[in-house]
Amino acid sequence: KESAAAKFZRZHMBSSTSSASSSNYCNQMMKSRNLTQDRCKPVNTFVHESLADVQAVCSQKNVQCKNGQTNCYQSYSTMSITDCRETGSSKYPNCAYKTTQAQKHIIVACEGNPYVPVHFDASV
């Protein structure tokens, strides 16, 4: 079974590019990372930074998660991210996404030993 940390990497990490390559980026990535397998995942964020830099956020600014838990952390610096949001015309299995590139602080939930990101909570 895929670990929570491995799932975070599959769903949210794209260190190979510094930003979204094209407006088609989300359509390609959401499919290749298996985020459209049994349904269209409505919203997803990819982070274009090294895994080490994203894992380091777990020792940065402690903030409350959207669900009220206290194991969320906000990055001190902004990071290159791509937001993928399902379009109005999207219909499973032909999931369609709008690609939006941004520089924002990320908020992740961390757990385990080693203490690593397991959930992408928000960007601010």
Curated annotation (Swiss-Prot):
Record GO biological process: defense response to Gram-positive bacterium
GO cellular component, one term: extracellular region
Enzyme Commission designation: 4.6.1.18
Glycosylated sites: 34
GO-annotated molecular function: lyase activity; nucleic acid binding; ribonuclease A activity
Catalytic reaction(s) noted: an [RNA] containing cytidine + H2O = an [RNA]-3'-cytidine-3'-phosphate + a 5'-hydroxy-ribonucleotide-3'-[RNA]; an [RNA] containing uridine + H2O = an [RNA]-3'-uridine-3'-phosphate + a 5'-hydroxy-ribonucleotide-3'-[RNA]
Keyword Lyase: yes
Cystine bridges: 26-84, 40-95, 58-110, 65-72
Annotated tissue distribution: Pancreas.
InterPro entries: RNaseA, RNaseA-like_dom_sf, RNaseA_AS, RNaseA_domain
Residues binding substrate, per UniProt: 7, 10, 41-45, 66, 85
Claim: ATP-binding is one of the keywords in the record: no
Enzyme class: lyase
Keywords: Disulfide bond, Endonuclease, Glycoprotein, Hydrolase, Lyase, Nuclease, Secreted
Stated family: Belongs to the pancreatic ribonuclease family.
Protein name from the UniProt record: Ribonuclease pancreatic
Organism: Eudorcas thomsonii (Thomson's gazelle)
